[in-house]
C-alpha cells in the first residue's frame, strides 16, 4: 500500500478488508496501476509466505477423517493458485486434495462467483448442492457456497449475525476447526 501512495493498514484492518481475490480487489484499490501494485505485492509475499504457513488446529485431523470415507476434498481459495498449491505441498496436504486446489485466477472468475466450485468438482461426477459442504471463514466463502446451493459452514470467530453475512448467512457456524472436527467424528 505504502509503495503505491496509500496509508498502511494494521493487521486488523487487513483481516477485515481482504476478502476478494487480488485480480478483483486491486483494480478497485489502485485503479490503472493495479498491475504494478500486484507485482510489488507478490514480490514481497513470495519472500515470506511459505515461512509463515501453519496448520490450523484440527484441520488436518478433520480432512484425515473425511478422505478415507470417500469424501471428495478440494480447496477453493482467493489466494493465487500457485501460492495455494505451494502451501499445500509444504504442509504435506497434497495427498488429501488430489489436484483439486483451485486458487484465484485458476477459474474464469474468483469467489464469490461459483466458477471455482465447479472447477473443484470437475471430473468427479459430483454436482454442487445441499449434500456438498462448503466450509469457509469469510462472507465471500459463504456467498460462493450459497450461490452454488451448497451447505455452507462458517468456521472462525466472524459473527454470522453481523451485517456482512446478512445477504448470505451460513447454514452452520463453528468457532474452530477443532469444533467442526467433533461433528465430523460423529458422522
What are these regions (language model features)?
Residues 1-61, 67-69, 85:
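N-terminal helical cap/lid subdomain that shapes the substrate entry/recognition surface
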Residues 7, 72, 151:
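Residue-level detector of anion-binding/catalytic polar loops
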Residues 69-70, 168:
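Structured helix-beta-strand junction loops
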Residues 2, 12, 64, 80-81, ...:
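Asp-based, Mg2+/Mn2+-dependent phosphohydrolase catalytic module
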Residues 49, 73, 106-110:
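Short, surface-exposed loop/turn motifs that are enriched in glycine and acidic residues
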Residues 17, 76-78, 135:
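Structural motif
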Residues 49-53, 78, 152:
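Short, flexible loop segments at the rims of nucleotide/cofactor-binding pockets, characterized by
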Residues 13, 53, 75, 132-133:
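Residue-level marker of alpha-helix boundaries and capping positions
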Amino acid at each position: 500500500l505504502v509503495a503505491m501512495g496509500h496509508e498502511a493498514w494494521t493487521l486488523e484492518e487487513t483481516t477485515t478488508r481482504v476478502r476478494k481475490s487480488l485480480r478483483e480487489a486491486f483494480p478497485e484499490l489502485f485503479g490503472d496501476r493495479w498491475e504494478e501494485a500486484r507485482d510489488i505485492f507478490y514480490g514481497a509475499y513470495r519472500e515470506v509466505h511459505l515461512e509463515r504457513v501453519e496448520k490450523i488446529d484440527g484441520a488436518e485431523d478433520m480432512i484425515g477423517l473425511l478422505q478415507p470415507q470417500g469424501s471428495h476434498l478440494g480447496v477453493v481459495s482467493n489466494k493465487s493458485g500457485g501460492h495455494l498449491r505451494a502451501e499445500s505441498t509444504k504442509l504435506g496436504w497434497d495427498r488429501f486434495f488430489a489436484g483439486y486446489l483451485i486458487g484465484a485466477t485458476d477459474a474464469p472468475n474468483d469467489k464469490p462467483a461459483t466458477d471455482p466450485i465447479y472447477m473443484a468438482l470437475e471430473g468427479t461426477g459430483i454436482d454442487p448442492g445441499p449434500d456438498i459442504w462448503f466450509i469457509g471463514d469469510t462472507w465471500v466463502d459463504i456467498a460462493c457456497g450459497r450461490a452454488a446451493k451448497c451447505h455452507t459452514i462458517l468456521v472462525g470467530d466472524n459473527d454470522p449475525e453481523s451485517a456482512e453475512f446478512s445477504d448470505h448467512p451460513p447454514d452452520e457456524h463453528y468457532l474452530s476447526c477443532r469444533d467442526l472436527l467433533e461433528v465430523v467424528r460423529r458422522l
